[in-house]
Amino acid sequence: MPEQEPVPPTETTSPESDTPESSDAPAFDPRPILARMPGLPGVYRYFDADGNILYVGKARDLKKRVSSYFNKTQLSPRIAMMVAKIARIDTTVVRTEAEALLLENNLIKALAPRYNILFRDDKSYPFLRLTGHKFPRMAYYRGATDRKHQYFGPFPSAHAVRESMQILQKVFQLRTCEDTVFNNRTRPCLLHQIHRCTGPCVGAISEDDYARDVSNAARFLQGRETEVLEGLQSKMEAHAVQLEFEQAAAVRDQIAALSTVLKRQAVEEVGQARDIDILAVAVQGGRACVNLAMVRGGRHLGDKAYFPAHVDEAAMIVEEGDEADGSAHEGAAADTDQLPIDRIAARVLSAFMVQHYLDQAPPPIVVVSHRPADSALVEALSMQAGRKITLVRQPQGQRKTWLEMAAQGAGLALARRLAEQGSQEARTRALAETIGLDLEDLATLRIECFDISHTAGEATQASCVVFHHHEMQNSEYRRYNIADITPGDDYAAMRQVLTRRYQKLVEQLQEAGGDPAGDGGDGVPRMPRVVLIDGGKGQVEVARQVFEELGLDIGLLVGVAKGEGRKVGLETLVFADGRPSLELGQGSAALMLVAQIRDEAHRFAITGMRARRAKARTTSRLEEIEGVGARRRQKLLTRFGGLRGVMAASIDELASVEGISRTLAEEIYRQLH
């Protein structure tokens, strides 16, 4: 598709935007801005009186679409509730509906409006990487790609990458060790002994033979299995003709291993092998699930489920707006018998595809369970990718099987989520009632929990985990390295982490004009409604002092004190504002949620502390040995590939390193064992 010259969008803002609505201010009058609004493609944004974003929408005809919200006398209760909150309207005019669709979803991802279908940002997808080394290393990789190495994927999950790596290790025996280990190894590792690596580090395989294995592995990952099998067959026969029966047997084992793998996997027929995404949607109980299955080179790599927020409200809003300006997909609009649940699925699918493929181009073929609701979707995705994207609604053969598998996976994942959500919402409600929180929407309850972890004062680290929208928000977790305190002083560690966390937050709120005691507005950092402290009265008192120094509400603070004998279920909630402590009992739903969040904070702190401690010990153990300076330490680490190699070396091997005497080698060995 030829690239279009970008045209600057035209922005319009309602005049009411400069006058926040007060309790006695007149109701918002949309007529002035509607009178000036053009009948052109574009994006509109609704804001409430506090400047919070309510909704972002796109339209083929802005005037018709926006007017429809204010002209209708019969609006659904949820849409009427949103319209009643509107205090400002911003619009952006673009050239085409496809451009409007892309801009709309850029804004949705950036602003996260209350009434839009939202898919949470996830980590970037992982790849399998073959490095550009003379003897390429096979590795799991996540991040930006470059031209120095070969990348295969993306894969839907880390498990899918590691599963493929295990296959390649078994069939082609490629190395997985770090280059520093590879360059300094003097004897083969365990992987060579169990036939999972050909041992290029010690010259057990020639550069040419290893390069052939790498080439075969790359072809396998590209879906060219037949070429690989034919090449191996020819190689085996050539060895047999030369009476090289041992080499022929090794190639025969490769063929057998590869054939076994191919029988287990669902692979598309030769000649049809393509990169394909399969998208299946399930809708139930006001929630939805999009299951994305990835096929690369004709091989099914696995799937991953996504769960959007605000499904009901957003689907209704878009549905009514589409009828006003004719933006609905022609096929969908003509299907008067389409069930409401299918229309919601179509909306969810459209939202997912645009939000998901904004940051990464889709493959040439996307198989879908429902016809997407937006007529401009294919054009927008093709424009974004710079090539034609084909949607397949009714696949045949292996692709049909894959779609059925994805649909079944979506249904099962949604059923699990609904069951979990029911119990989780009940726990959230129980906790809110127990500690006296007055919330209109339980999903807005934001809880931050802190824990301190160390080993006898070494490598002290604090963790902060976040619970919001009835689930843990992994992307918002933070670790804090604690320094300049007496080792083992948990009170000082808690004071330091709380000060660092909330002093910065208060400053950000003040810069943005927000209220530290409030929830923040659009783009403004948000204070939690509850701050859980893993500890009893002493820890809570430290937290109270920090909050008072920062001018924060001490009523947010709740300590989780361990019960008698540290038994689970006997915990007590300790409040900083003078309320009496609460013993909830083992059957308490509120305590279950508190324990879940606290245990997650503890897990997160422990893993960070262990990693930090291991890193510190890796560098410090040799530093502590008298006579081993920086130069000798570097020679030892280079020769043996790291501290583990040094620890595994004998006294004779240590003494063979330049600059290490027999006496010093004995001392090093004694100190490390």
Swiss-Prot record:
A GO CC term attached to the entry: excinuclease repair complex
Q: Which PROSITE patterns match?
A: GIY_YIG, UVR, UVRC
Q: Which residues form the UVR domain?
A: 226-261
User: Which parts of the chain are coiled coil?
Assistant: none
Instruction: Please provide, alphabetically and separated by semicolons, the GO molecular function terms listed in this UniProt record.
Output: DNA binding; excinuclease ABC activity
> Which key words are in the record?
Cytoplasm, DNA damage, DNA excision, DNA repair, Excision nuclease, SOS response
Gene3D superfamilies the UniProt entry points to: 5' to 3' exonuclease, C-terminal subdomain (1.10.150.20), GIY-YIG endonuclease (3.40.1440.10), UVR domain (4.10.860.10), UvrC, RNAse H endonuclease domain (3.30.420.340)
Claim: Nucleotide-binding is one of the keywords in the record:
no
The places in or outside the cell where this protein is found are:
Cytoplasm
A single Pfam family, by name? UVR
Gene Ontology biological-process annotations = nucleotide-excision repair; SOS response
List compositional bias (Low complexity) regions by residue number: 10-23
The record's listing under InterPro entries reads: GIY-YIG_endonuc (IPR000305), GIY-YIG_endonuc_sf (IPR035901), GIY-YIG_UvrC_Cho (IPR047296), RuvA_2-like (IPR010994), UVR_dom (IPR001943), UVR_dom_sf (IPR036876), UvrABC_protein_C (IPR050066), UvrC (IPR004791)
Q: How does it assemble?
A: Interacts with UvrB in an incision complex.
Q: Which family does it belong to?
A: Belongs to the UvrC family.
What name does the UniProt record give this protein? UvrABC system protein C
